[in-house]
Amino acid sequence: MDFLSHAMLSRSESTQILCELSQIDESTMDPQYTEDDVLARLFVFSSSSPQTVLNVKKYEDVSVGRSNTCNYQLLQFTASYKHFRVYSVLIDDDMDPLVYCEDQSSNGTFLNHRLIGKGNSVLLSDGDILDVRHCASFLFQQKYTTDNDFHHEYAGERFNITQRLLGIGGFSRIYMAMDNNTGGQYACKIIDKKKISTKRFFEDHEMTILRKLDHPNIIKVNMEYNSETQFFIFEEMVTGGDLFSYLTKLGTVPEVTTLFIMFQILQGLKYLHEQNIIHRDLKLENILIASSSDTIFRIILTDFGVARCMQKGKRLSTFVGTPEYTAPEIQRLKGRSQVEKENSSGYGKEVDLWSLGVIMFLLLSGNSPSFADGVKEKQVDFRDPVWKSVSRQAKDLISNLLKTNPPDRFTVKQCLSHPWFARHSSRLTKLYETRILKPLKHSRL
């Protein structure tokens, strides 16, 4: 059978599904689920079995394939042992859960007639149809809040900006956008110029910085667009959530997983600092996960809204960042007049390393750092029982990152030379090349 005939058959099957849907008892389609932990549902249509409903629950994957361990087993040999999985990401309590489908198959999983591709994940929207051709089709149903403030001035032809809200920031909202040429999904950050002090704030800083960045551990910008009152940044769709949702799910992150997470963050920071760029707002929410299917995943630094390019010999003196992650030298600027700030010693790249120490402490313990009085300065408090299972090297690295005196704080280079990384250096490098760089290069061809 040629490709066209195959595609026509699939469309015919989908049409048949839609006909069957019109005959379904509406009570079974009620979006008000009886179970609190049910986030969405998949209605299964197959000629070889009766209609089935699969519930997508909080922190539970729904797997489909030939394996008898799958939530829904496909009997046809054209299906893969593990064909696809549906999983959810909960960003925070104020946001609707985001539900994704990861294609794990050799023969392909199709979303609304478009091939997803093995190893790729897509965001699912209410009414989407997943197809495992010649096996079964799955209608996705999810009730989510419609953004009443949705409005945009994008007049370009390449993208269609949908009302699927992915995130909310101080000056912006992030929506799902579709590439009209390829059907690919993107995250569109819409910045409201009326909410910022000057129109040049983001245009001169965030986009100036993002335009010249090209690194596996830094968010990739595909396009930008400028209108009278809005600024648009079209970024790669990242489908694994962020480190905050990841930590919330696990409670604490195993040390071996934290090791590779920290290694990647440092690769991104090394790249930024070599170009004299300071992020200034590193936190769990601004570090994304490319995929949640494994303990080995790509880490992506995002949100460069307050990032700055440092001029040689100059220090920064603006009070910015998130208090929980902010370095002491930035905290000391709070409440000071502009003259006092300018006369202060300011701060530099060291602030990103303090934030990194807070992140590492949070990942390993699930709590924010606390300090005990020391002889010369406050010491990181590791008395909580959770630290008994954490290595001495990991705690030593945290202590060197959370030095209140900036010159005493570890640099990126010192971090990567620390025994916690150094004793695993060759393995970390190989893992980074084979599991991060190689797949990414292949996906961007």
Swiss-Prot record:
GO BP, one annotated term: meiotic recombination checkpoint signaling
SUPFAM superfamilies found in the cross-reference section: Protein kinase-like (PK-like), SMAD/FHA domain
Domain FHA per the UniProt entry, residue ranges: 62-116
Positions in coiled-coil regions: none
Active-site residues annotated for this sequence: D281
CDD domains: FHA_MEK1-like (cd22670), STKc_CAMK (cd05117)
InterPro entries the record matches: FHA_dom (IPR000253), Kinase-like_dom_sf (IPR011009), Prot_kinase_dom (IPR000719), Protein_kinase_ATP_BS (IPR017441), Ser/Thr_kinase_AS (IPR008271), SMAD_FHA_dom_sf (IPR008984)
Catalyzed reactions per annotation: L-seryl-[protein] + ATP = O-phospho-L-seryl-[protein] + ADP + H(+); L-threonyl-[protein] + ATP = O-phospho-L-threonyl-[protein] + ADP + H(+)
Highest taxon of source: Eukaryota
E.C. code: 2.7.11.1
MF (Gene Ontology): ATP binding; protein serine kinase activity; protein serine/threonine kinase activity
Top-level EC class as recorded in UniProt: transferase
Gene Ontology CC entries for this record: cytoplasm; cytosol; linear element; nucleus
Residue span, Protein kinase domain: 160-421
Matching Gene3D superfamilies: 2.60.200.20, Phosphorylase Kinase, domain 1, Transferase(Phosphotransferase) domain 1
Signal peptide as annotated in the record: none
Pfam families hit by this protein: FHA, Pkinase
Role this protein plays: Probable protein kinase required for meiotic recombination.
Protein name: Meiosis-specific serine/threonine-protein kinase mek1
Source organism: Schizosaccharomyces pombe (strain 972 / ATCC 24843)
Source lineage: Eukaryota, Fungi, Dikarya, Ascomycota, Taphrinomycotina
